[in-house]
From Swiss-Prot:
Protein known as: HTH-type transcriptional repressor PurR
UniProt-listed GO biological process terms: negative regulation of DNA-templated transcription; purine nucleotide biosynthetic process; regulation of DNA-templated transcription
Function in brief: Is the main repressor of the genes involved in the de novo synthesis of purine nucleotides, regulating purB, purC, purEK, purF, purHD, purL, purMN and guaBA expression. PurR is allosterically activated to bind its cognate DNA by binding the purine corepressors, hypoxanthine or guanine, thereby effecting transcription repression.
Keyword DNA-binding: yes
Pfam families assigned to the protein according to its UniProt record, in alphabetical order: LacI, Peripla_BP_3
Coiled-coil annotated spans: none
Domain HTH lacI-type: 2-56
CDD domains: HTH_LacI, PBP1_PurR
Subunit structure: Homodimer.
Length: 336
C-alpha cells in the first residue's frame, strides 16, 4: 500500500507539499499540483482517514441505529440519510439491531470506539436500557427519529402519529363509514398508542362508537395481517373499513381478503399508513397516510450536522405532518 512518502518521492517534492495539495491547505503551483496528483493516480494512493481524524478531530462518519433495515418504511428513510451523507462527504455506518439489547449495546460501544461524529437513532423499541446507553455517551451528538426513545441529550424528530391516525379515520368517516376496524402493530409501541388515540378522536368527533373487538393487534408484518383478515372474515358482523397502521399489513390484509372473495373496496375498504413506494402498485392502488420518509432522513442528517457544529445548543424537537394520499381502496358510501 502506497504511503505519502512514496507519492512525494515519485513527484519529486516533499511530503509537506503532498499534504498541502491533497488537503488544499496552502497555495501550491499548478505544475506541482499536477505532478502530485499524477503520482497519487499512479500509486493509487489513499490518505489515511485515521491520521486525518486524529489531526482534525473528526472522522466524517455517522452511525445509524435501526430496528430492522429490511422494513420498507425504515429502508426508505435510510436511503434518504445515505444519499445526503454521500453528498456531504460523510460515511454512514448502518447498525441493524433487530431490537436486541446486546446488539444495541455492542453497536453503540463500537460506534463510540470508531469516534463517529454523531449517531442517528431509529429504533422502535422504547426501552429504558437503550435510553440509558445513549445518555451514557453525552459527548456524541445524537438525533432520535420517528419511534425512538425520549432522551434529554438528543434532538428529536416526531412523526405525529396521533394526527396521522386521526386523518386516516376522518377520511373514512367523511365517506360514510361508521363501522371501522383498526389493525395496529404491537399495542405497547408508542406510535401504535398514538394512532389509536387519533382513531378514537376521529370516531368521537363523528359521534361513532368504537367496537373494541375490532381493534386488532399485529406486528407490522404481513403474517399477522393475514391472521387479522381471517378474524374479520369469521365475524358475524364485519366492519366496512379497516385502518391498517402500516402499508405492509394493508398489503397482507388485502391479499387475504381478496383470496377469500372479498372485493376491495366494493365489499370492504382499506386505508394504510406510510405511503411506501410499493403502495401505488398494489391492486388496487392503496389509499394511505403519507410520511415524508426521505425528507425525514434529510432533515435528521441536517439537524445532526448542526448538533455536531454546536454541541451546547439546547435540545430541539422537530415535527413532521402526515397527509392523506388518495387512491382506490376506499369506497365512498355517501354516493351509494
Amino acid at each position: 500500500m502506497a504511503t505519502i512518502k512514496d507519492v512525494a518521492r515519485l513527484a519529486g517534492v516533499s511530503t509537506t507539499t503532498v499534504s498541502h495539495v491533497i488537503n488544499k491547505t496552502r497555495f501550491v503551483a499548478e505544475t506541482t499540483q499536477e505532478k502530485v496528483m499524477e503520482a497519487v493516480k499512479q500509486l493509487n494512493y489513499a490518505p489515511s482517514a485515521v491520521a486525518r481524524s486524529l489531526k482534525c478531530n473528526t472522522t466524517r462518519t455517522i452511525g445509524m441505529l435501526v430496528t430492522q433495515s429490511t422494513n420498507l418504511f425504515f429502508s426508505e428513510v435510510i436511503d434518504g440519510v445515505e444519499s445526503y451523507c454521500y453528498r456531504q462527504g460523510y460515511t454512514l455506518i448502518l447498525c441493524n439491531t433487530g431490537g436486541i439489547y446486546e446488539k444495541q449495546r455492542d453497536y453503540i460501544r463500537m460506534l463510540a470506539e470508531k469516534r463517529v461524529d454523531g449517531i442517528l437513532v431509529m429504533c422502535s423499541d422504547l426501552t429504558q436500557e437503550l435510553q440509558d446507553m445513549l445518555d451514557a455517551h453525552k459527548d456524541i451528538p445524537k438525533v432520535v427519529m420517528d419511534w425512538g426513545p425520549e432522551t434529554s441529550h438528543a434532538d428529536k424528530i416526531i412523526d405525529n402519529s396521533e394526527e396521522g391516525g386521526y386523518l386516516a379515520t376522518k377520511y373514512l368517516t367523511d365517506r360514510g363509514h361508521t363501522e371501522i376496524a383498526c389493525l395496529s402493530g404491537h399495542f405497547v409501541k408508542a406510535a401504535c398508542q398514538e394512532r389509536i388515540q387519533g382513531f378514537r378522536r376521529a370516531m368521537a368527533e363523528a359521534k361513532l362508537t368504537v367496537n373494541e373487538d375490532w381493534i386488532l393487534e399485529g406486528n407490522f408484518e404481513c403474517d399477522t395481517a393475514v391472521l387479522a383478515a381471517d378474524k374479520i372474515i369469521a365475524m358475524d358482523k364485519r366492519p366496512t373499513a379497516v385502518f391498517c397502521f402500516n402499508d405492509t399489513m394493508a398489503l397482507g390484509l388485502m391479499s387475504r381478503l381478496q383470496q377469500k372473495g372479498i372485493r376491495i373496496p366494493e365489499d370492504m375498504s382499506v386505508i394504510g399508513y406510510d405511503n411506501i413506494e410499493l403502495a401505488e402498485y398494489f391492486s388496487p392502488p392503496l389509499t394511505t397516510v403519507h410520511q415524508p420518509k426521505r425528507r425525514v432522513g434529510k432533515n435528521a442528517f441536517e439537524i445532526l450536522l448542526e448538533r455536531i457544529k454546536d454541541k451546547e445548543h439546547e435540545r430541539r424537537i422537530f415535527e413532521m405532518h402526515p397527509e392523506i394520499v388518495e387512491r382506490d381502496t376506499v369506497k365512498d358510501l355517501t354516493k351509494s
